[in-house]
Amino acid sequence: MFANSLRRITKPCLGVPDMAVRHIAMRPKPKVKVNSREGGGKGKPRPSTGVRRKPPGAQKQQPASIAINGDAARRLLESKFAANISSFNELKLHPDVRAVLPDVIQLPEHKQDQDIKPSIIQSLAVKIMRQSYTYKQRVKNEGEEPTVEKIPVDRQKTFVLAAQTGSGKTLAYLLPLLSDLKDQEKFPSWQLEKHYKTVRSVILVPTLELSQQVGQVLKQFEEPLGIKTFASAFGQSHQEIAKAFNNRLDVLVTTPQKLQQTREKNLGGATHLVVDEADTLFDTNFIDSTTDVISQMPKLKCAAFVAATVSKSFLRKLRSFYPHVVVIAAPRLHAIPDHIRFSVVDVNKAPYYNNKKVALLQALYAISHSQKQKNYVRRVVVFRNRKEHIPELKKFLEENGYPVDTLHGKQDLHERNEVVEKYTNMPDAADQTENARNVRVLLTTDIASRGMDMKNLRFVVLYDVPFDKTDFIHRVGRTGRFGREGEVYMFTDNQDKKAQTNQLLHTSRNGLSL
């Protein structure tokens, strides 16, 4: 079977010669990477066009290391701490937030009596971000007995939260955020503030698809915690948005562009900010709208910038606004997890003879006969570099009997929303009749590679070699999420640059800096 030949080079099958397929072993990376030279990278951040407003809390740039791993000794201690955490009960969470977790993290039936173990990035985020919320005491004389009141220290904390795709980063930033919002409700001032028409915290994301996904997670906390949330979504009317801002909002999830278009917003009271997929929201297409929105939050106490890929240029850019940002990075950042089986298929060699379509049919045939996920329709995400190439491949697959969905930027919002809902929900049960293929293909571009949690997705095909290491990591990261097994096939031919392909594979093994 083709799938077996992908797993081990030494096992030929279906007439596929060993030289056509390379299985890439994910070699373990050393636990600690020693910090690079202090003093920042070469050159200065590229100047932007036009006027850009610096966010509140932004300071004059200071020399700072751009190495994402920071101090080696501190990283080692943090990793050991996270590895020793066996339950959320050991972390400093608000009791009400902790009580909701069993309903949010749905365990299989045979594990429901066990404690829920946080991922490494969740343990690190809660430990470091919650310890950084500092308060001071103020003695008040009321009547005969003096009282001691806790008030928050007026100082902004800024973090970068970096971990592999599928490692639970959404909960890693939501748990400290929600715990701190609940802690604020203990202060006497809350009795007045709870009636204000204001937004207490903002989560910025690059797409409405991701906004809906984060909003669905937040909805599970809403009633138990007594909080009010709102997430921007497809097809919302202006009246719906205006109604949401007409009351107190504890958590707002939206895109920078959507927020700029909303006239009723009141961000002046927001104390917490999360920028999810921050490397995207700080690139040239988004940075002006992102920084404009952040500048409207003068009372920020805590800001977290979350990403699966943290390049030196991104970190340098972020430190131009926040020189003392604290980096919270999980081990093996930028490396493909060991539970993902990664294989390279050289389509120049027999039996494909430079025909990627034949290689794709062979891969889909093997997947349809796999013993993995045999109780469900097996969903396969096939990535292409350009949306213009999707219609032709869709027609070819449909002519060969495969049901195909597409997701790309040229589709209208309603069509995109239908596809997103289909793949972020559980797959359909398998057709048990003989010769049923039980495979469904999603043809897409990078629009589906960022943040989307596709339920029970095991198989990914990189039909085109990604343009760069960042795209590569995000595409591969659609499978193998939350420790589940995944399989990735990357097709290469003579048109692909050997140096670029080898560089991607080197990154996948070692988790090198971008």
Swiss-Prot record:
InterPro entries: DEAD/DEAH_box_helicase_dom (IPR011545), DEAD_box_RNA_helicase (IPR050079), Helicase_ATP-bd (IPR014001), Helicase_C-like (IPR001650), P-loop_NTPase (IPR027417)
UniProt: ATP binding residues: A163, Q164, T165, G166, S167, G168, K169, T170
The encoding gene: MRH4
This protein's UniProt keywords: ATP-binding, Helicase, Hydrolase, Mitochondrion, Nucleotide-binding, RNA-binding, Transit peptide
Top-level lineage group: Eukaryota
Family named by the database record: Belongs to the DEAD box helicase family. MRH4 subfamily.
Motif extent (DEAD box): 276-279
Role according to the record: ATP-binding RNA helicase involved in mitochondrial RNA metabolism. Required for maintenance of mitochondrial DNA.
Annotated ranges, domain Helicase ATP-binding: 150-328
Protein name per Swiss-Prot or TrEMBL: ATP-dependent RNA helicase MRH4, mitochondrial
Segments of this protein annotated with the region Disordered: 26-64
Domain notes from UniProt: The Q motif is unique to and characteristic of the DEAD box family of RNA helicases and controls ATP binding and hydrolysis.
Reactions this protein catalyses: ATP + H2O = ADP + phosphate + H(+)
Species the sequence originates in: Yarrowia lipolytica (strain CLIB 122 / E 150)
Range annotated as the organelle transit peptide: 1-55
GO CC terms in record: mitochondrion; nucleolus
Enzyme type, top EC level: hydrolase
Motif window: Q motif: 115-122
GO biological process: maturation of LSU-rRNA from tricistronic rRNA transcript (SSU-rRNA, 5.8S rRNA, LSU-rRNA)
Helicase C-terminal domain ranges (all copies): 359-514
MF annotations from Gene Ontology: ATP binding; ATP hydrolysis activity; RNA binding; RNA helicase activity
Main location group: mitochondrion
Annotated EC: 3.6.4.13
One Pfam family it belongs to: DEAD
